[in-house]
Amino acid sequence: MKNILDKIFFRFNNLDHISQNIKALSKNTPVKKIFDAINFYSSDSEIRFVGGCVRKIINNENVDDIDLATNLEPEEVCKALKKNNIKYYETGLDHGTITSLIDNYKFEITTLREDVLTDGRHAKVKFSRDWKKDASRRDFTINCIYSDRDGNLFDPYEGKKDLEAGYINFIGDPDKRIKEDYLRILRYLRFFLNYSKQTHSQEIISKLKINIDGISKLSKERLLDELKKIFKLKTLEKLSQDQKSKDLIKLIFPELKNISVFSKLDTNKKKELKNNDFIFFLSLMIIDGTDNSDYFLYKFNISNQNKKRIKIIDNFFKNKLGSNTFSEKKMNKIFYYEGKQAVIDILNFKMIKSKKFDQNLFELLTLYRNKLKPKMPIGADILMTKFQIPEGKQLGLKLKMIEEEWVNNDFQISEQQVKNIINI
């Protein structure tokens, strides 16, 4: 009878590494406290792992975020946590999400939901006690797999099967699911690049393109956040190799002109690229010698600090590059005036874009990663006391001239050189 019931409810019992890793997750994190708090709240209360953490365990990936689903309403979740002295925040109460913090671990606990109204950006929901209905509102089959803490799966749309076969399938009608939240266009691309072992379904690609204008309804922050996740993928190289994926992302981000760069990386370049962040990846994509990067920065909400970082790279490569452009002397100037990050970005940019591995660039990168910014040995106090230069415009001018000479001379300057500048 139990086997029949398990089949009816789409359950899979103790599936090898899955159950072992789920149990390990319960053992190695404080999530057990949350399971106990919810499961013992009432006779029918229940909580399960859901979404990314289950997907990653099935796929033998490291789990970073732990999401949980429960049939308790948010107020009941708060009562259960409070009763067990578990710290929590009502971060998304309207959408049924409570965030719990235990020993520096963060857990998001979300009540089962049904969509009442969607507008392409957000959903108005009502709370539910129906696990199947909660699953049916999710985007892809691989994201609606639930598990109890013993590794027993609830998988109503056969997400495990799709994950193992490398299919990225929407739950239900793709057109309907996309119109509920247009961010799913980018999410589809991210999951395809990361998990697909198949070619794109022509039906899905067609529906994605038909709905592409809906992207304009989304905030720039949500779009950039999803782009960051794509750039973090270990399978990013696939983006430049798969024409349909490349065409799709260019419809959303037309300023990403240099996607093909990821298909031409040797082992050294791939290793170097791993050490870089989203802003550097973005620079590689949008800097092309035109005003393309300016337009992207105008459209999207990039911090002033990161805008400056991209502009330093852009301006550097808009200048004519000579045989001594990447000399230590030239790099020292950038290092002193713009900072370590600017030098590393410029050297990395050149190395990734170069057709062949350049040992000089590699050695310069190693040098500047470990180099501390030097401090000019001559200050205003010395000029005033030793050389009797009064405070004022002349003092500032001489100090700047000395600084320029010191930087141009690889951060060295003699007393005679200082005297020569003062006597000009």
Feature locations, PLM:
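Catalytic cores of the polymerase beta-like nucleotidyltransferase superfamily
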Residues: M1-I424
